[in-house]
A protein has these predicted regions:
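N-terminal, charge-rich interaction modules
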Residues: 34-66
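Short beta->alpha junction loops
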Residues: 93-102, 154-159
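Glycine- and acidic-residue-enriched helix-capping/strand-helix junction motifs
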Residues: 63-78
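Short, electropositive alpha-helical surface patch
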Residues: 104-118, 175-184
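Mid-chain, well-packed structural core segment of small domains
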Residues: 107-142
Length: 184
C-alpha cells in the first residue's frame, strides 16, 4: 500500500511539473498592424468582428406578432437590444425581417456576397402556430441548405436570445470592447 501511494504521488508530481504554465506559453501576436485592438489583455481577440451571422425573422409590426401576445413595441425593442448586444460582443449581424406573404427572393438576395459563419431563424417564425408561417419556416431552412450548405443553422428562443444562440457554437475567447462587430 505504501508503494502504491508513493508511485501515485510521484506520478502526480511528474504530471504537475510537465504541465505548461501561463509563463511557458508562447506569446501570441494578436495585434497586427492596422488592428483596432489595443495590446491590453481582455479587450480584444483576433476573432472580434470576423464572424458573420444572419437571422431571418418576422417584422415587429407583422399581424402574427400581435396574435402571439406581444406588442410590436416589445418585439422591436427586443430585436434592437439583441442586435446591439451581438455587435457589442464582437459579432457581425444582419437581421432579415419579412413575413410569409413576402418572397423568399428577398432573403436569398440578402445572403449573397457575404461569407456567413452561420445562419439563423428567429422564434417569431419558429414558434408561430400559423400554418403559413410554419411553411415559411420550412422554406427558409431549405433555402439555407441550398445557399449556405456548410453553415450551421442557429435558433434563438426569444427576441433577445440570438447572442445566446451564436455563443453556443461560436464563443469568442476574449472580450471585444475595443473591436466590436458590425450591423450588416
Amino acid at each position: 500500500m505504501v508503494r502504491l501511494l508513493s508511485i501515485l504521488m510521484l506520478g502526480l508530481a511528474v504530471f504537475a511539473a510537465a504541465s505548461p504554465t501561463a509563463s511557458d506559453a508562447a506569446p501570441e501576436d494578436h495585434f497586427r498592424s492596422g488592428s483596432r485592438c489595443a495590446p491590453v489583455k481582455g479587450n480584444c481577440s483576433p476573432a472580434c468582428g470576423k464572424y458573420n451571422f444572419v437571422f431571418a425573422g418576422l417584422p415587429w409590426n407583422h399581424p402574427a406578432i400581435a396574435a402571439s401576445g406581444f406588442t410590436p413595441q416589445q418585439v422591436e425593442a427586443g430585436i434592437r437590444q439583441d442586435m446591439a448586444a451581438i455587435v457589442k460582443a464582437g459579432y457581425n449581424i444582419k437581421a432579415v425581417l419579412f413575413g410569409p406573404e413576402d418572397s423568399l427572393d428577398f432573403l436569398s438576395s440578402e445572403l449573397k456576397g457575404v461569407d456567413w459563419t452561420a445562419v439563423g431563424v428567429g422564434f417569431g417564425i419558429r414558434g408561430s402556430p400559423s400554418p403559413n408561417i410554419t411553411r415559411r419556416f420550412m422554406d427558409i431552412i431549405q433555402l439555407y441548405r441550398e445557399e449556405t450548405p456548410r453553415e450551421r443553422i442557429l435558433f434563438n428562443y426569444s427576441p433577445v436570445t440570438s447572442l445566446w444562440a451564436i455563443q453556443q457554437y461560436f464563443p469568442l475567447p476574449m472580450n471585444c470592447t475595443d473591436n466590436m462587430g458590425k450591423d450588416l
